Regions:
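Short, hydrophobic/aromatic-rich segments at coil-to-beta transitions
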Residues: 1-4, 150
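FAD-dependent oxidoreductase catalytic-site/capping-region signature
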Residues: 95-288, 296-305
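Glycine-rich loop(s) and the adjacent beta-strand/alpha-helix scaffold that form part
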Residues: 3-100, 106, 171
Length: 305
């Protein structure tokens, strides 16, 4: 790797490294930069009239992400976090004072107040579903504001078998890549999501919750009808922003980096981000990604200091 071309305010600068370059743009950005640099599968690069400099068929492949389904229930009390006339005039002023003087109350909430790792089926060796309980009504990642009060529960598939990809739209470095997670393309993922949904609803329908619930804010779903559950999941499930795997570590033909994060066949280039994970972990990706950076710094210092 010779260096990098940097654009700032539409002006181009070229930088070079004395020892090696580190690529750390995430599971979407790292393969995008490599493909636009001519590193990756030849058919993907050449069709955009980019010079093909090194063949690595795994660049941009093996995309994995956690798919998540959210159930939301309206609540008949202002006890929980929400927006209403009662809460605006009678609750929020007191909550502000509680936070200012005692650091307690709803403004100390993490929103994800409780969680659980469960098995979608008893035959599973380890948990494959993660639940997040939230004491408020949030849909569409908070982009849509719901009036009133309620509670919700996220159901996340931890170990999906579906694999997606990141490809180029064009040779334009300012154009976003094509990102296709191919959620639920493996049939086992849907079956696990259906089983996980049923277990989640068993919890949400317990008396401790149901006696306060006014109605389900999403469309009604027949818990005994797998096809109804499947349709809801296909239409409403979404990402929780844990993409990995598009520059995976390994020694097989689809691997992009070795066990020192060095790009196969390219001198002086490492990838240091979540894209190097061969397989998505069964939990949040933040801490493991920090670990990757820490481990990479240790290996780099051992090589050069």
């Amino acid at each position: 790797a010779a260096g990098e071309c940097i654009n700032k305010d539409r002006k181009y600068f070229t930088g070079s490294a004395n020892q090696e370059g580190l690529l750390s743009s995430g599971a979407f950005g790292s393969p995008q930069i490599m493909l636009r640099s001519g590193i990756g599968p030849s058919e993907e690069i050449l069709k955009h009239d980019i010079e093909h400099t090194h063949d690595l068929p795994g660049v941009g492949k093996n995309l994995q992400d956690h798919i998540d389904y959210l159930t939301v229930h309206r609540y008949n009390s202002i006890e929980l976090i929400g927006i209403s006339l009662k809460s605006i005039f009678f609750k929020f002023p007191f909550e502000v004072l509680k936070y200012v003087f005692a650091k307690v109350g709803i403004f100390t909430s993490t929103v994800a107040e409780a969680g659980a790792f469960i098995k979608s089926k008893e035959s599973k060796d380890i948990p494959d579903i993660q639940l997040h309980f939230i004491p408020t009504m949030v849909v569409d990642h908070g982009r849509t504001t719901l009036w009133g009060h309620g509670l919700g529960c996220h159901m996340c598939l931890l170990r999906p078998k579906s694999r997606g990809e990141v490809t180029l739209k064009s040779s334009d470095p300012f154009e976003d890549p094509n990102i296709d997670p191919k959620f639920l393309s493996h049939p086992d993922d849907m079956q696990d999501m259906i089983a996980g949904y049923k277990k989640m609803m068993m919890i949400m329908n317990k008396d401790s919750f149901s006696k306060y619930t006014v109605n389900h804010t999403m469309r009604p779903i027949d818990i005994n009808d797998d096809s109804d559950i499947e349709q809801a999941i296909r239409e409403e499930a979404d990402t929780v922003y844990h993409p990995v795997g598009t520059c995976k570590m390994g020694n097989d033909e689809m691997a992009v980096v070795d066990n020192k994060l060095k790009v196969h066949g390219i001198d002086g280039l490492r990838v240091v981000d979540a894209s190097i994970m061969p397989t998505l972990i069964g939990g949040n990706t933040n801490a493991p990604t920090i670990m990757i950076g820490e481990k990479a710094s240790e290996m780099i210092m051992n090589d050069w200091i």
